[in-house]
Amino acid sequence: MPKKFGRIHLVVMDSVGIGAAPDADKFFNHDVETHEAINDVKSDTIGHISEIRGLDVPNLQKLGWGNIPRESPLKTIPAAQKPAAYVTKLEEISKGKDTMTGHWEIMGLNIQTPFPTYPEGYPEDLLEKIEEFSGRKIIREANKPYSGTAVIEDFGPRQLETGELIIYTSADPVLQIAAHEDVISREELYKICEYVRSITLEGSGIMIGRIIARPYVGEAGNFERTDGRRDYALSPFAETVLEKLYKAGIDTYSVGKISDIFNTVGVKYDMGHNHNDMDGVDRLLKAMTKTEFTEGFSFTNLVDFDAKYGHRRDVEGYGKAIEDFDGRLPEIIDAMNEDDLLMITADHGNDPSYVGTDHTREYIPLVIFSKSFKEPKVLPVGHFADISATIAENFSVKKAQTGESFLDALV
């Protein structure tokens, strides 16, 4: 079967969810002050930002963001009379609301055993191994679920004095190491993270989904995390559609932390880590305009929505970031060929107006655009992996574990 689309570009607006998922009652955030567990039933990332701050997103509105099925319409994003794109929302079937789970399911995997989390912090024997390898002590008081900005506010001054490591976790399956660049160089931090990754793989006794390097700079009271973040993930436990494309000889481009999330498996050309989301758009455009990129798949993650604004519960910053991305959409569309397909989605929610500091269990929006479309419409609500099943069918490779293609619906 001939390809319907020569190139497919998938852009993940990290954490930009569109309302509580049907199973949101099984997922929780914890009140920062009372530590009370509150389920995610009332979470609604786009909806609450639209309601509280307002969103001026003319390009996403024309594509049909306001047409996505919801119990109540978005306050400041009206439905388009004739949307320029197919739109819908997708439900997650995997047992997790973290980055790896979301991206892996989008690429066709069904994660029914959630990655282990460490709400009480990491065990002493692991910390001792890290101390022995690094030659640095670890601040034990930080070894618990912590906001990334709060942990450096609380322990950054001490690290500047002592050179101790700040190791912390969250409600997600991650071990994060924060290091002030004046005390611990990026190179040293990355070596420590690589070591931790090597001793926390499956079968090692303690498995961790991702090890994250978190360098920062500044002075007490004015610390700022830098763009030197690195994620050290596990390899997917089964073949994803990304890997199937690669093995079939189809060009695959990654932008941002996609290569980290999949541990490079299935990535042929890595466009590098983003300094920020606008730099990520620049990198995507650079990939799209490469003369040799005539057919294939690009996969982009824009993480600032999540890392800079969602976890920090910054409604204003989050809204501004969405508007900034909206302002770049015409450039992305201009760079598309007539037979290109653009899909814009998310990987989970992170409602900046919600209790706690962690992700929220939500539907994700899906916008599907091509210059060749005649009369786009609203598609039935589907599942995350429908994206990869559609990509797989287009490029004549087998889908992964789950997902139903909607390729035939795109006319």
From Swiss-Prot:
CDD domains the UniProt entry points to: PPM
Annotated residues for binding of Mn(2+) 2: D306, H311, H359
Pfam families, per the entry: Metalloenzyme (PF01676)
Residues that hold Mn(2+) 1 according to the record: D14, D347, H348
Cell location: Cytoplasm
GO biological process: 2-deoxyribose 1-phosphate catabolic process; 5-phosphoribose 1-diphosphate biosynthetic process; metabolic compound salvage; nucleotide metabolic process
One example GO MF annotation: magnesium ion binding
Broadest EC class assigned to this enzyme: isomerase
Entry-linked InterPro entries: Alkaline_phosphatase_core_sf (IPR017850), DeoB (IPR010045), Metalloenzyme (IPR006124), Phosphopentomutase_DeoB_cap_sf (IPR024052)
Keywords (A to Z) from UniProt: Cytoplasm, Isomerase, Manganese, Metal-binding
Cofactor note: Binds 2 manganese ions.
Metabolic or biological pathway, per its Swiss-Prot or TrEMBL entry: Carbohydrate degradation; 2-deoxy-D-ribose 1-phosphate degradation; D-glyceraldehyde 3-phosphate and acetaldehyde from 2-deoxy-alpha-D-ribose 1-phosphate: step 1/2
Any one GO cellular component localisation term in the record: cytosol
EC number(s) reported in the record: 5.4.2.7
Reaction(s) this enzyme catalyzes, per UniProt: 2-deoxy-alpha-D-ribose 1-phosphate = 2-deoxy-D-ribose 5-phosphate; alpha-D-ribose 1-phosphate = D-ribose 5-phosphate
Cofactor(s) named in the record: Mn(2+)
Keyword Oxidoreductase belongs to the record: no
Function text: Isomerase that catalyzes the conversion of deoxy-ribose 1-phosphate (dRib-1-P) and ribose 1-phosphate (Rib-1-P) to deoxy-ribose 5-phosphate (dRib-5-P) and ribose 5-phosphate (Rib-5-P), respectively.
Protein family (similarity comment): Belongs to the phosphopentomutase family.
Protein name: Phosphopentomutase
